[in-house]
Amino acid sequence: ALIAAGVARVVAAMKDPNPLVAGQGLTQLAAAGIAVTSGLLEAEARALNVGFVSRMTRGRPWLRLKVAMSLDGKTALNNGVSQWITGPDARTDAHAWRARSCAVLTGFGTVRDDDPRLTVRDIDTPRQPRPVVVDSRLETPLTAKLLVGGALIFAARHDAEKINALTTRGAEVVVLPNSAGKVDLAAMLLELGCRGFNEILVEAGARLNASLLREGLVDELLIYQAPVLLGDKARGMADLPELVELSAAQRLTITDRRMVGVDQRILALLN
């Protein structure tokens, strides 16, 4: 269409990372005598399309782990109560991140304890993100609210009767065990990439958060930090092992920090 329109110059922010078509369009334009420039604001373009770039170059979605925490780094009281640590503005902002995601990933423990829908609320959106559950032992209740949203459940054991019951209620079950009898998280991300998922928002508990972090599968942290202190007995964001050397600490790069209502929002890339 551009060639037929007779344009004299085309400026592209970046080449298409899809290996099937990468650069071919720009090559065709140049062959037709059109002046072509690419790379203008490329970093910004990649940031806008971070999920698609991830899927094209790594075969898996961009994984963004969202956490709402206190100033002392706690995500819930020791009894599990966490509603609400952050204020209404932060919660609305979090729904905007859900809206831009292809799926919201959680674990069985969150489904059991909170029975979330993982849907976008109070924001207009053309589609809802798909709920994805890591449930190694296939224990998701048949009454779970997210089944109505066509949940995709990853399990480590095959139970034909339970799978059939979950499928009847609208879910899809994929069995992907690792050698330890748990869900193979890396294989799960590759499967999600094959299904066309670009960005995944993780809203899970400390155990799944820790597993994803330990395996190096988290690309970015989305942290909402509220001006409140919950004390040393409250729960943390991830059940990670104790470090004895600072050199072993996971380093992050903060890319954005701003106030959302009374809470602070931090975006950080994992190095």
Give each language-model segment a name.
Residues 240-271:
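Conserved histidine-centered catalytic loops in small-molecule metabolism enzymes
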Residues 17-20, 43-44, 112, 139-141, ...:
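Short gly/pro/ser/thr-enriched loop/turn and capping motifs at secondary-structure boundaries
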Residues 1-44, 130, 213:
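Zn2+-dependent cytidine deaminase-like catalytic core
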Residues 9-10, 103, 199, 220:
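Residues at the N-termini of beta-strands
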Residues 51-198, 207-210:
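Active-site ligand-binding patch in enzyme domains
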Residues 214-252:
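Flexible, gly/pro- and Lys/Arg-enriched active-site loops
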Residues 18-32, 145-146, 163-170, 236:
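Active-site-proximal loop->helix
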